[in-house]
């Protein structure tokens, strides 16, 4: 009995070695044969345009890519069948994969919602910054015009003071005009002080908004990186993993394709 088992094990080992040798030779020689069947002579391509050559290289790359994918799929399929004992995927494995996939999808959706909220907040803050900037620029223009008026009033006042120093009699209407100019000058100075204080407050508010915007940009970048990490965790396939994990990844991809077909 033990001898039969050992003989059977020896036969299975030889078969496995032969199949592995065939697979290795197929992997080594397959691309060469494919390249030999699809390669075009270099002398014939010289007379063609660069665009036509580029199209040929693209088609060749597509064929080679498909061939490599087909070879890898065949190899994984054969290794899964010829394992001793053969690898079987149970319903529990599928349920675990579905649970993991659903949890990852939920996390991805929540991250997407957070990113959308951050984007809306950034847009709102940008609009507020734009409106505040426009109002500050308008106030600056008004301040410039007020300063020009102030300079003209100061020049007129200086002229009146020079005229008064010549001991010429001041007419009542001129004296009234001087008082009016002085009161207007005081009002203008008060308005300038008010505008300066408002400009300082607006500058502080603008600096605070700029800081908030930089923080929001950092949070948006972090959320985008987390979203990309989750996507990569869902779609990443490790070529050097064991056969069982590769089959599980294959089932996961099939489930995603079915979900996409159902959503359409």
Swiss-Prot record:
Principal localisation: nucleus
Taxonomic superkingdom: Eukaryota
Cited InterPro entries: Sos7, Sos7_CC
Subcellular location: Nucleus; Chromosome, Centromere, Kinetochore
Sections of the chain in a coiled coil: 90-236
GO process terms (BP): attachment of mitotic spindle microtubules to kinetochore; cell division; homologous chromosome orientation in meiotic metaphase I; mitotic sister chromatid segregation; protein localization to kinetochore; regulation of meiosis I spindle assembly checkpoint; spindle attachment to meiosis I kinetochore
GO CC term, one of those recorded: Knl1/Spc105 complex
Record keywords: Cell cycle, Cell division, Centromere, Chromosome, Coiled coil, Kinetochore, Mitosis, Nucleus
Pfam families in alphabetical order: Sos7
Function: Acts as a component of the outer kinetochore KNL1 complex that facilitates microtubule-kinetochore interactions and the spindle assembly checkpoint. Kinetochores, consisting of a centromere-associated inner segment and a microtubule-contacting outer segment, play a crucial role in chromosome segregation by mediating the physical connection between centromeric DNA and spindle microtubules.
Family: Belongs to the KRE28 family.
Record's subunit section: Component of the KNL1/SPC105 complex composed of at least spc7 and sos7. Part of the outer kinetochore KMN network that includes the KNL1, MIS12 and NDC80 complexes. Interacts (via C-terminus) with spc7 (via C-terminus); the interaction is direct.
Protein's UniProt name: Outer kinetochore KNL1 complex subunit sos7
Organism this protein belongs to: Schizosaccharomyces pombe (strain 972 / ATCC 24843) (Fission yeast)
């Amino acid at each position: 009995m033990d001898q039969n088992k050992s003989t059977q094990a020896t036969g299975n080992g030889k078969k496995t070695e032969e199949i592995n040798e065939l697979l290795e030779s197929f992997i080594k020689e397959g691309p060469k044969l494919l390249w030999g069947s699809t390669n075009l002579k270099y002398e014939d391509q010289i007379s063609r345009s660069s665009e036509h050559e580029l199209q040929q290289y693209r088609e060749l790359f597509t064929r080679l890519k498909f061939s490599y994918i087909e070879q890898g799929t065949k190899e994984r399929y054969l290794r899964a069948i010829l394992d001793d004992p053969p690898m079987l995927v149970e319903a529990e494995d599928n349920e675990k994969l579905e649970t993991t996939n659903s949890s990852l999808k939920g996390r991805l959706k929540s991250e997407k919602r957070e990113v959308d909220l951050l984007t809306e907040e950034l847009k709102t803050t940008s609009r507020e910054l734009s409106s505040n900037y426009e109002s500050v620029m308008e106030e600056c223009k008004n301040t410039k015009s007020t300063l020009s008026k102030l300079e003209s009033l100061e020049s007129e006042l200086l002229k009146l003071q020079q005229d008064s120093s010549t001991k010429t009699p001041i007419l009542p209407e001129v004296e009234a005009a001087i008082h009016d100019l002085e009161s207007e000058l005081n009002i203008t100075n008060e308005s300038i002080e008010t505008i300066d204080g408002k400009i300082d407050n607006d500058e502080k508010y603008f600096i605070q908004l700029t800081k908030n915007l930089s923080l929001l940009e950092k949070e948006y970048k972090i959320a985008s990186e987390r979203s990309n990490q989750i996507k990569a965790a869902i779609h990443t396939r490790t070529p050097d993993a064991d056969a069982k994990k590769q089959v599980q990844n294959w089932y996961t991809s099939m489930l995603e394709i079915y979900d996409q077909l159902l959503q359409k």
